Amino acid sequence: MASQGTKRSYEQMETDGERQNATEIRASVGKMIDGIGRFYIQMCTELKLSDYEGRLIQNSLTVERMVLSAFDERRNRYLEEHPSAGKDPKKTGGPIYKRVGGRWMRELVLYDKEEIRRIWRQANNGDDATRGLTHMMIWHSNLNDTTYQRTRALVRTGMDPRMCSLMQGSTLPRRSGAAGAAVKGIGTMVMELIRMIKRGINDRNFWRGENGRKTRSAYERMCNILKGKFQTAAQRAMMDQVRESRNPGNAEIEDLIFSARSALILRGSVAHKSCLPACVYGPAVSSGYDFEKEGYSLVGIDPFKLLQNSQVYSLIRPNENPAHKSQLVWMACHSAAFEDLRLLSFIRGTKVSPRGKLSTRGVQIASNENMDTMESSTLELRSRYWAIRTRSGGNTNQQRASAGQISVQPTFSVQRNLPFEKSTVMAAFTGNTEGRTSDMRAEIIRMMEGAKPEEVSFRGRGVFELSDEKATNPIVPSFDMSNEGSYFFGDNAEEYDN
């Protein structure tokens, strides 16, 4: 594991980051959660939502989106400079669902962005509370990761749909800051860099002039973030090469795709945080729980305990399975879209199925969907055990799947062997070891050749009973190896469309 001396913990990324002790970090994260909760309570009052309606996850998503849009300065500026028909750049809104006369009705609400900003700041002691906004962005990103497979985006950038386990955070907005960068997968960073290089190839002014200097420094910063996620010297050296290139072009794209493929076996460190919807924090705050005083962590038992005691509802379409909808949201809450399903089933205490076997579409309801046939049901978000989130790739001291996903990106720090289909991964590495990065490529391939899927990662780490808050008695799970480990297994999940 890379020396962590230079890295800040997530919580420091979540906070404004001077070194803090554990208690201060917990209080500071708790304060952020309090702010989201207070904001949500206030919005439910503004919208005149009943308790049940306020706990509806679709209403939560609309409210979260409204505040994110109200604070999206770049887009707000763009909308004011490029007025489009029928869009008021000063307003934000979305669908709010209410129970009227025994059925669900959709109501489109519209608010001044200024008003939403005022309510948000008031809930956050007058601050802009950017951390709380980022927290909601990560929750939306985790929900997208669980709902959609990014096949099309992968293919467009010349990558392979089987690399979907590297795509965590691929829908996070640019403005998500350090906390956002921490949760982005290797493939996400590679894709952002490839898009940038392609623009440079097609537009000769991209790297030039005053703007080009900013572009260049953004490029180098992204390369450094990606380099920091790799755990082997050869992969990092390769990133130095890409970063230092005078004129990034196809050679760099090749190197980036190579390094992304290598991450299927030599996994990068990607942070995982349990970010819950605002409709979980709101009721907890209104019941008198003081997150700042009690302290809160996104990577320990706290989110599990909170979900054990929360009641969240969802709209259900006529042919959807409420249990499947629950699994989708449960996985999103724990940022577990790319974790091994055998492990998730163990932690959750009920079988977790691959995406393609779930009879459920996304959580959001499109504006043209018929509300007459909508029912609602309780989401089952409780778990049997809890486990500590990891930000390492879980590589063994050195370092079986399908046509769909062929590797995992661990979420929980729990002992298991990390399944990957070695022959499938290695088949992608035939031939091309020439060029300036040939020695690094050879070294990376050598390490991958030596990796054994049956080797155990996170040795000795286990899950914990929910009563074991201090994590004193790890329970090391045993797995049925015959079971499929990948969520996007040869899959038919819908595509994510911006």
Swiss-Prot record:
Late in virus-infected cells, may be cleaved from a 56-kDa protein to a 53-kDa protein by a cellular caspase. This cleavage might be a marker for the onset of apoptosis in infected cells or have a specific function in virus host interaction. GO terms for biological process: symbiont entry into host cell; viral penetration into host nucleus. Pfam families: Flu_NP. Signal peptide: none annotated. Residues 1-21 are annotated as: Disordered. HAMAP family: INFV_NCAP (MF_04070). Belongs to the influenza viruses nucleoprotein family. This is Nucleoprotein. It comes from Influenza A virus (strain A/Shanghai/11/1987 H3N2).
